[in-house]
């Protein structure tokens, strides 16, 4: 039986006019071999759970495959606040779409596929280091429940790629419900291709925002949806301590899914000003700046959509961003603290908690996990995470008093055991700390991919105890704290 028998393909973007893309064939790497195949995810598309040579040949661009029509998308974007018209898929190709078991279509994008007309000064390649980081982080984010692109698999080769040092060329098979970015609309606006921009908006509504089609103002409704989804994504980032590192508008998905993993980082100590991108000298994309930058990016998209949407409608949608973000962030924080009900004083509880975490350089993830285990462990386990134990005890007393006010749907008090069980499903034990990714990369560069596989599997179940992997939940060593990552990939 053919391995493709239960798989459905299409390629709607390739049916758009040529102004949107250039057809490009992948340039195969030398001696390509699997690093990882995401078998559980693959099965959701009717693909085999086990990697094989036929999948390798098709998904690494070594052999032609009829359902695929590889293309490089053209877009633009604001990078560190400056408009750059010369962007596009410089090393990635949109191969096709594949149907998920729930009926959703996912793009198949091959990253590291070679030169395209949009490669500029690049070589069209990706290296093993950055490919592993994106594979692991997209799986970690999915495990946490944060909106994200996914990874179907990755391959490595013997092809040398020259960065700060000579590295091995690799490819990532990235999956996303769309690869349409804010920058697609910006490109068409700034080049005055307004008919094409309207066509793209029509197709985006048809493919992704069907409910907007029947709205009185479909394009305004579409933009409103993009604002809401972006706010939701940022709320998750801030609640889970994720710093993206390079929030350019060409890295912003219209569906509010975390996109393009480069110099990202999860918080170790709670540090609002954390900068994970080695090249972000001004701290534009620091952790605490992410909500502001998301709104800035949405404003840039609003400007680009001004031929389609009236100014007051754009302003109305943008005005909803902060309220939606605050609402979603508060919901997530209440969940992390095991609070089902909502009272006015919760804001002060949150603020004093963040102040305490910041002043004491407390590990963000371990704090919430320790708080989740108060039914099993003494409160001292939480107190000991702080330098100022007296202040920590005072906050914990306030928190526990607040928990006493919690009741369930029928007005009965919620037990500590019930609350802790729910909190353990919200506060991860395991996150992708940069030092863990680096250890996996170091082994992989020596030809041992076992740590990549182990780490990916741990991160797919971040809320589970997994006692055999306790070492992966430890504090990072000194060399692994607050790592800044280069953009060179």
Curated annotation (Swiss-Prot):
Enzyme Commission no: 2.7.7.-, 2.7.7.108
Molecular-function GO terms, alphabetical: AMPylase activity; ATP binding; magnesium ion binding
Binding site for ATP: 88, 90-91, 111, 123-124, 174, 181, 260
Protein residues bound to Mg(2+): 251, 260
Primary enzyme class: transferase
Keywords from the UniProt entry: ATP-binding, Magnesium, Manganese, Metal-binding, Nucleotide-binding, Nucleotidyltransferase, Transferase
Pfam families: SelO
Location of the active site: 250
Top-level taxon in the UniProt lineage: Bacteria
Coiled-coil region list: none
Keyword set includes Lipid metabolism: no
InterPro entries: SelO (IPR003846)
CC cofactor: Mg(2+); Mn(2+)
Catalytic activity from the UniProt record: L-seryl-[protein] + ATP = 3-O-(5'-adenylyl)-L-seryl-[protein] + diphosphate; L-threonyl-[protein] + ATP = 3-O-(5'-adenylyl)-L-threonyl-[protein] + diphosphate; L-tyrosyl-[protein] + ATP = O-(5'-adenylyl)-L-tyrosyl-[protein] + diphosphate; L-histidyl-[protein] + UTP = N(tele)-(5'-uridylyl)-L-histidyl-[protein] + diphosphate
PANTHER family to which the protein is assigned, alphabetical: PROTEIN ADENYLYLTRANSFERASE SELO, MITOCHONDRIAL (PTHR32057:SF14)
Purpose of the protein: Nucleotidyltransferase involved in the post-translational modification of proteins. It can catalyze the addition of adenosine monophosphate (AMP) or uridine monophosphate (UMP) to a protein, resulting in modifications known as AMPylation and UMPylation.
HAMAP family for this protein: YdiU_SelO
Similarity comment: family membership: Belongs to the SELO family.
NCBIfam families for the chain: PRK00029.1
Official protein name in the record: Protein nucleotidyltransferase YdiU
Organism: Vibrio parahaemolyticus serotype O3:K6 (strain RIMD 2210633)
